[in-house]
A protein has these predicted regions:
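Conserved active-site "lid/cap" helical segment
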Residues: 1-87
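Conserved catalytic cysteine-centered active-site region
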Residues: 45-53, 61-63, 94-117
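Short glycine-rich or small-residue beta-strand-to-loop segments that form or flank ligand, phosphate
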Residues: 87-94
Length: 117
């Protein structure tokens, strides 16, 4: 058994345009109709200046979790032959689009043109 593993390429995908801290609540909404009182404190402490949301300002989803993974995999620029030679695909998320079928099964279906649902 060959136990060596090599990372040959990496890719990422971020949806839509970056959203500034000032625009956050336009995407996420207000708390009881009011701006968050702790937002400035948290943002000052975490240092994040922009972020990406997979939704519009009226909270319409633009990309699913599976879409994000599929776009990142597409970004690897693999030929169909190399893609078909993948022997193991590991996926993880803290917030799946759905529980069944699993996130990994859904990504596998999207990547290998064999949708699960």
């Amino acid at each position: 058994m060959n136990s060596s593993v090599y990372l040959n390429r990496i890719a990422s995908f971020l949806p839509n345009s970056p959203v500034s801290n000032d625009e956050m609540e336009l995407y996420l909404g207000l708390v009881n109709g009011k701006a968050s009182r702790v937002k400035p404190i948290i943002l000052r402490q975490n240092g994040i200046k922009t972020r990406y949301y997979a939704l519009t300002k009226d909270q319409q989803i633009t990309h699913t979790n599976v879409d994000l993974a599929k776009h990142a995999i597409d970004g690897l620029g693999l030929s169909e032959d190399k893609l078909n030679n993948i022997q193991f695909l590991s996926c993880g998320t803290s917030m799946p689009d759905q529980y069944m079928p699993s996130h990994a099964a859904m990504v596998h279906g999207a990547v290998f043109n064999n949708p699960v649902a």
